[in-house]
Amino acid sequence: VPLLFALTAGGAFSVVYGLTSALRRRGPGKWASWGPAAAGIVAVLMVVVLGNLGGAAQIVSNAWNAVTSGASIPPFDFWASSRMMPGQIIITEFPFWTFLFADLHAHLIAIPFTLLAAGLSLNLVLTSGEARLNWRTAVLPLGALALTIGALWTINSWDYPTYLALGVVA
């Protein structure tokens, strides 16, 4: 599970860093030199740390109750954020919860591969207009994308159609 966490963080950083670097090169205006790195760090936080707003709501609610009634702040309920629909058993897990509790399911294992597929697709889009691109330099990225999307079929088939469409569009 720690390896999947690290691969997910690295994938999120890489995809967003690559995208913002490309926008910085192509777009008008001035971007700070640290802009792509900052965007990558924000992406890591958003993908692997931040989840739904249930945790934030719980903290605010418990703090408000402590301030207004003088009661002590109860311990944080990690499970509450994974079941957000009152009166129902709808599971609303998010990556941090899944990593925290080592809930090793296909949707967790697939996250680094979905980011890899997104990154490889982005690479194809960003390099498609380069003059030096020929069939030899395109075979490796296309092969890697095909292998990654094919692996998603085995890892978590629910992700396969989405990333197949993304790969075809790229």
Annotate the PLM regions.
Residues T98-F101, L142-I155:
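Membrane-interface alpha helices of multi-pass inner-membrane proteins
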Residues T20, R26-L45, V139-L140:
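Start-transfer (signal-anchor) and selected internal transmembrane alpha helices
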Residues W34-L100:
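Aromatic-rich transmembrane-lumenal/periplasmic boundary elements in polytopic membrane proteins
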Residues L164-A170:
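Hydrophobic transmembrane alpha-helices of multi-pass, membrane-embedded glycosylation machinery
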Residues P2-R24, T114-L120:
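Transmembrane-helix motifs of polytopic, lipid-linked glycan transferases
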